[in-house]
């Protein structure tokens, strides 16, 4: 049922985009015809009637914003940026700590009790628990207080947001520990801030429809935890969706948790072995 509803939602989005394109084209054609022939019609009317027709409004349009009630750029973009900020800063913290461990050689202390999968898994879970606790407190301020202070759209259920944060923080922590493969010092992760910012907003599907992206960008959407989490959070918080309506993104985050947990265990074991060999060769 969930797969059927997701497919139906994708079809609806595509049809809606086609409808918008056809509506814009037909409106443009009608306005062009009106500009061309309306002046010729006014020639045959009395002057007092012509002035009334020119000033008349044939249709009174009253617009009502469904979600972004202020229709501002900030209220549209900032909710998505909040999740990206959490992802970037958590990734940066994990990268700096992991890079410092490798640079100083202190990572070898984890080899004292062996390098079995169970031992490495306990190390990864322990680190992830600390990161998640700290960022849960950070999320209370960022996602709970900031929308109230700045009048951002906030019509979602806080329980649903909390349910979404659990796999998001886990997946981000495991992703960061797996990415420590590339960090050999504490300065390298700082470069990720400028690299990821704009791209993550694009990949999330908030600023540009995911259905219109090339297939490789759609694949990237399901690889980086921030992308599905951002899309799900905007739907939950700004559009009032339920957790079932963001089921695809929610399941994606849990799948990422499993994949990146296993990858983080392998990467950390490799980093420990590499540091141990370097220490023994001295």
Residue ranges and their predicted role:
Residues 133, 144-145, 153-282:
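Membrane-spanning alpha-helical segments of multipass transporters and channels
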Residues 1-12:
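Single conserved hydrophobic/aromatic residue that forms the stacking wall/gate
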Residues 5, 79, 125-126, 189-192:
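Hydrophobic core positions of alpha-helical segments in small-molecule transporters
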Residues 21, 25-28, 32:
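Extracytoplasmic/secreted proteins, especially bacterial periplasmic and envelope-associated proteins
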Residues 15-19, 23, 172, 222:
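Solvent-exposed, acidic/flexible segments
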């Amino acid at each position: 049922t969930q797969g059927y509803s997701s497919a139906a939602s994708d079809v609806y989005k595509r049809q809606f985009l086609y409808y918008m394109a056809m509506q814009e084209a037909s409106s443009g054609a009608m306005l062009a015809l009106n500009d061309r022939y309306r002046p010729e019609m006014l020639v045959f009317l009395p002057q007092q009637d012509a002035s009334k027709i020119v000033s008349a409004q044939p249709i009174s349009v009253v617009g009502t914003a469904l979600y972004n009630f202020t229709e501002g750029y900030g209220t549209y973009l900032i909710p998505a940026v909040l999740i990206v900020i959490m992802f970037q800063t958590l990734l940066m913290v994990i990268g700096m700590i992991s890079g410092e461990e490798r640079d100083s050689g202190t990572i070898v202390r984890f080899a004292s009790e062996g390098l079995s999968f169970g031992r490495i898994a306990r190390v990864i879970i322990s680190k992830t628990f600390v990161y998640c606790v700290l960022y849960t407190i950070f999320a209370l301020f960022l996602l709970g207080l900031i929308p109230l202070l700045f009048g951002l759209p906030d019509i979602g259920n806080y329980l649903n947001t909390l349910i979404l944060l659990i796999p998001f923080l886990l997946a981000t922590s495991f992703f960061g520990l797996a990415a420590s493969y590339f960090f050999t010092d504490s300065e390298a992760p700082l470069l990720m801030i400028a690299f990821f910012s704009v791209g993550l907003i694009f990949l999330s599907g908030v600023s540009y429809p995911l259905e219109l992206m090339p297939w490789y960008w759609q694949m990237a959407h399901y690889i980086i935890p921030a992308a599905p989490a951002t899309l799900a959070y905007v739907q939950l918080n700004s559009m009032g969706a339920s957790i079932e309506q963001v089921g695809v993104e929610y399941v994606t985050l849990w799948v990422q948790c499993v994949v990146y947990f296993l990858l983080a265990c392998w990467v950390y074991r490799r980093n420990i072995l590499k540091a141990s060999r370097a220490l023994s060769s001295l």
